Amino acid sequence: MNQYSEYALIPKKKPFLYRAALNYYSAYHAGLKSFAELYKDLEHYIDDPNRRWNYVLRVKRGITDTSIPGGLYKDQVYLEGAVKILKDRKSINFYALISGKISLEDLKRNFLMKILRLDNLMIPPFMRDMKKFMKGLDRIAKVNFID
C-alpha cells in the first residue's frame, strides 16, 4: 500500500491496483499454463513484449521445467492483503500493524494489544501524516471500487 498512498493524493492520477491484479492473474495462471502459454495469454493485457516477459519470469522463476504448469504464488497473497487492508482501513491500528510481524488477524487479539510496545516505533515516511495516509487509502479504495 505504501507505493500507492502518496500517488493517491495527486488529483489527476488514478491509483489503480492493476499491477497487483496483473501479478495475481499471472500467478494464478502460472499454475495452469507453461511459460510460453502464459506469455501468449498475457498478450491480451500487456502490449510490450519485454514487460510481458518480466511478468512471466517473475512467477516462473526457480521452476526447473517451465514447459509444465507451476509457479510462485506469493503475488496472490499481496493483492488479497491489499484488498483486506482497504476494506478494513477504518478499523485498523496501523501503528500496531507496523510494529512487528503482525497480521491483520493478530490485531483482533486483545492480549496482543496489551503487550505491544509502540513507544520508539519507527514510523515510515508515508505514514508520518496519518490523516494524509488515510485520505490516500480512501482514494485508492474508491478508485478500485473497494468499500
Language-model features: where?
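Conserved alpha-helical "signature site"
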Residues: F16-D147
